Amino acid sequence: MALPLDFEKPLFELETKIDELRTFSQEKDLDFSSEIATLEQKAEELRKKIYRDLTPWQQAQLARHPDRPNTIEYIRLLFEEFYEMKGDRLYGDDPAIVGGIARFQGRPVTVIGHVKGKDTKENIYRNFGMPHPEGYRKALRLMRQAAKFSRPIICFIDTPGAYCGIGAEERGQAEAIARNLLEMAALPVPIISVIIGEGGSGGALALGVADRLLMLEHAVYSVASPESAASILFKDASLAPQAAAAMGITAERLKDLKLIDRIVPEPSGGAHRNPIGTAKELATALSEEIENLLALSAQELVDSRYAKYRNLGLHCIEDASCGTFEAEATDASGT
């Protein structure tokens, strides 16, 4: 288990005391059941309070938690008969994106998602979830195949952003992302994308042009990381908490802005504390959304998807309550 985040430490310390008391009780054959029950109740109350009152910056930290389930874990928990398919048929494979065919509740689907590693070795192999162009081209190859065989597409988004190394730029990173946006907009099959952790910039958007964009309760979605935004706009990366508050990166804020379609609740304490419970909530949401989308014809899907993205931002034009970055940044920093 990874070290707790700063705001999780009071809960971690209380849970450690409960474990120590339970172990001591068993070793000494003593009955501390009432004391343990009291502490467990306090822990549950503290857990609810901590995760109910998270700031946007704390949400960003939680979205990056090393123990948070990644795409591979959700594939294992949600799908049957997954068969991975590799390579873009142009350059090579990219482990930062995994994809293939599977069954979801008996229905054939195509599954694609960013993958972060669970330890240093795997993070290096997965490039910390930052895809190269071949990753996005592999994803598009699988989407085209899904359209050919009339399979719904389910994408999992969890990336700090597309990799910006020299090799990636030489192989056409911007073109690969743009091509995905263009072709996803016109695919004649249902597309559901789920932000399960970080949704960073164009690297996330390249898997995010969907009929339904879902977001886990403690995930984040933004044009840049809070650190990058603070460095660019405030010339000080240490102001990332203020930038996070101003950027509107949380699921609740994005739902208010009509930029996402549905928030998928996480169990108390977040997905990293209960992956199975999170997967159950996600399975329910995916099942409902797929059924709704399958009721539409191919042309209706494409038309409604086009209208959905043409209307993005109109909410803010028509409703002055959206505010501005400068105003919200000032409120957040108090200056």
Swiss-Prot record:
What are the record's GO terms for cellular component? acetyl-CoA carboxylase complex
InterPro entries for the chain: Acetyl_CoA_COase_a_su, ClpP/crotonase-like_dom_sf, COA_CT_C
Q: From the record, what ranges are coiled-coil? A: none
Reactions accelerated catalytically: N(6)-carboxybiotinyl-L-lysyl-[protein] + acetyl-CoA = N(6)-biotinyl-L-lysyl-[protein] + malonyl-CoA
Predominant location category:
cytoplasm
Q: Which domain of life is it from?
A: Bacteria
Entry-linked Pfam families: ACCA (PF03255)
Pathway listed: Lipid metabolism; malonyl-CoA biosynthesis; malonyl-CoA from acetyl-CoA: step 1/1
Where, subcellularly, is it found? Cytoplasm
Q: What is its EC number?
A: 2.1.3.15
Could you tell me the keywords of this UniProt record? ATP-binding, Cytoplasm, Fatty acid biosynthesis, Fatty acid metabolism, Lipid biosynthesis, Lipid metabolism, Nucleotide-binding, Transferase
Q: Which residues form the CoA carboxyltransferase C-terminal domain?
A: 38-292
Biological processes annotated in GO: fatty acid biosynthetic process; malonyl-CoA biosynthetic process
Care to name a GO molecular-function term for this sequence? carboxyl- or carbamoyltransferase activity
Task performed by this protein:
Component of the acetyl coenzyme A carboxylase (ACC) complex. First, biotin carboxylase catalyzes the carboxylation of biotin on its carrier protein (BCCP) and then the CO(2) group is transferred by the carboxyltransferase to acetyl-CoA to form malonyl-CoA.
Q: Give the UniProt family note.
A: Belongs to the AccA family.
Binding partners and assembly: Acetyl-CoA carboxylase is a heterohexamer composed of biotin carboxyl carrier protein (AccB), biotin carboxylase (AccC) and two subunits each of ACCase subunit alpha (AccA) and ACCase subunit beta (AccD).
Q: From the Swiss-Prot or TrEMBL record, give the protein name.
A: Acetyl-coenzyme A carboxylase carboxyl transferase subunit alpha
